[in-house]
């Protein structure tokens, strides 16, 4: 399997030039890796795989459900072309047995090849996390035609804000858990250079975390524009907080309605958001902006990681496919206290998070509600699922306000 530089140098002429131009800064990161990897491999050979197998008896994440001693034994000595190992994939899941709100995946990828080299473990995890999607036999579809969306205007007495986000990874550079400092800085350079070409209502500027004051950072976090500081154990155990805040930042347009995070959990997170309940408008801007970002990236000789089985490749298997999370902040004081609320969400394929995101609790009965699936359905299908599902939640809240009963909807048909 080709390594990052061989893939780069076999690509288009413009990509070869960029790869060669960046070789001086990147070579150290690639060439200095093998020695510690070989040393670790030599130490490992002193012990059988059974002696290295992690204790997962109290774990309930997806990785722990599928990693058997036999699978571990077959995969533990394999590495990707950049030296990423199985133990590095699973460390975050070993260190974090479970989560109070959602069942986490418990593993990450270090590069694009991770999903192939360790497919024996990743494929069943992907199948569990993505509602039965089988990456060995199925193909993912992409659809960024926002004109297909029906309705998409929520009652703003309940929906406070609407947001659509995705992630994209730059092909040929390691993902955040594995990247060197040089690679991370190269991601920032490539992305920021491309974003400088955005025009019209998408035009904006880039802000490096290292150049912000603590107060400026916190204000952006409190306003839900910026990713939080890397305090989540899921991030730190995966190695994604290394060298913080080097080469991290946020780009946003002048209205702060179109944003790109750089080098947090993924190379990029592309976000369209605004206050209120106009999800259709948010998705239209998302599709238009994302297409333009990809065009600008390709114009400079780079491309996003993608394949027809897994869609867009990202760090966490939960974000494969579309990488899309369409969500609202919604106030549900009565429904949230109803014992049927979790089952309603489950049957609608929706996910509940706290007001501030994945590691927070709800305040004032305000929840972050979004699609559970990412892979096997297109962007249009997932946004429509959220629109229909959120409208159902609002209808339930209204019925409870009137003292009427609500019902659990039948499970959505599983169509991949």
Curated annotation (Swiss-Prot):
SUPFAM superfamilies: Glutamine synthetase/guanido kinase, Guanido kinase N-terminal domain. Residues 44-131 form the Phosphagen kinase N-terminal domain. GO terms for molecular function: ATP binding; creatine kinase activity. The modification Phosphoserine is found at residues 151, 196, 232, 365. The modification Phosphothreonine is found at residues 213, 355. It is a peripheral membrane protein. Residues 158-400 form the Phosphagen kinase C-terminal domain. The keyword Transferase applies. The keyword Hydrolase does not apply. GO terms for cellular component: mitochondrial inner membrane; mitochondrion. Pfam families: ATP-gua_Ptrans, ATP-gua_PtransN. Residues 1-39 form a transit peptide. It is found in: Mitochondrion inner membrane. ATP binds at residues 161-165, 224, 269, 325, 353-358, 368. Exists as an octamer composed of four MTCK homodimers. Reversibly catalyzes the transfer of phosphate between ATP and various phosphogens (e.g. creatine phosphate). Creatine kinase isoenzymes play a central role in energy transduction in tissues with large, fluctuating energy demands, such as skeletal muscle, heart, brain and spermatozoa. Mitochondrial creatine kinase binds cardiolipin. Belongs to the ATP:guanido phosphotransferase family. This is Creatine kinase U-type, mitochondrial. It comes from Sus scrofa.
């Amino acid at each position: 399997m080709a390594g990052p530089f061989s893939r780069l140098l076999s690509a288009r002429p413009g990509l070869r030039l960029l790869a060669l131009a960046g070789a001086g800064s990147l070579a150290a990161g690639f060439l200095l890796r093998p020695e510690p990897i070989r040393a670790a491999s030599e130490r490992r050979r002193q012990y059988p795989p059974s002696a290295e197998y992690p204790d997962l008896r109290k774990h309930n994440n997806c990785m722990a459900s599928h990693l058997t001693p036999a699978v571990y034994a077959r995969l533990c000595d394999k590495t990707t072309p950049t030296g990423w190992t199985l133990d590095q994939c699973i460390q975050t899941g070993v260190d974090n047995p479970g989560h109070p709100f959602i069942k986490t995946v418990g593993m990450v990828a270090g590069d694009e090849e991770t999903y192939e080299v360790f497919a024996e473990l990743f494929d069943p995890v992907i199948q569990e996390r993505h509602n039965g999607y089988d990456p060995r036999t199925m193909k993912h579809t992409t659809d960024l035609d926002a004109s297909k969306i029906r309705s998409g205007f929520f009652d703003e007495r309940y929906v406070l804000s609407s947001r659509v986000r995705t992630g994209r990874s730059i092909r040929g550079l390691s993902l955040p858990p594995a990247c060197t400092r040089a690679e991370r800085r190269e991601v920032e350079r490539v992305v920021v250079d491309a974003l400088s070409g955005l025009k019209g209502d998408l035009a904006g500027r880039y802000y490096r975390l290292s150049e912000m004051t603590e107060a400026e950072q916190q204000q952006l976090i409190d306003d839900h524009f910026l990713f939080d500081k890397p305090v989540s154990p899921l991030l730190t155990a995966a190695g994604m907080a290394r060298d913080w805040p080097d080469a991290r930042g946020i780009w946003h347009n002048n209205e702060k309605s179109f944003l790109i995070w750089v080098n947090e959990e993924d190379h990029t997170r592309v976000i369209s958001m605004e206050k209120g309940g106009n999800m259709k408008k948010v998705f239209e801007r998302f599709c238009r902006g994302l297409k333009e970002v990809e065009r600008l990236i390709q114009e400079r000789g780079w491309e996003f990681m993608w394949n027809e089985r897994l869609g867009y490749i990202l760090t966490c298997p939960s974000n494969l496919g579309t990488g899309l999370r369409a969500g609202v902040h919604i106030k549900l004081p009565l429904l949230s206290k109803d014992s049927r609320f979790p089952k309603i969400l489950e049957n609608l394929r929706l996910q509940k998070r706290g007001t501030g995101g994945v590691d927070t609790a709800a305040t004032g009965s305000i929840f972050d509600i979004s699609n559970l699936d990412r892979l096997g359905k297109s962007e249009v299908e997932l946004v429509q699922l959220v629109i229909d599902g959120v409208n159902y939640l609002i209808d339930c809240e209204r019925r409870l306000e009137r003292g009427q009963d609500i019902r659990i909807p039948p499970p959505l048909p599983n169509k991949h």
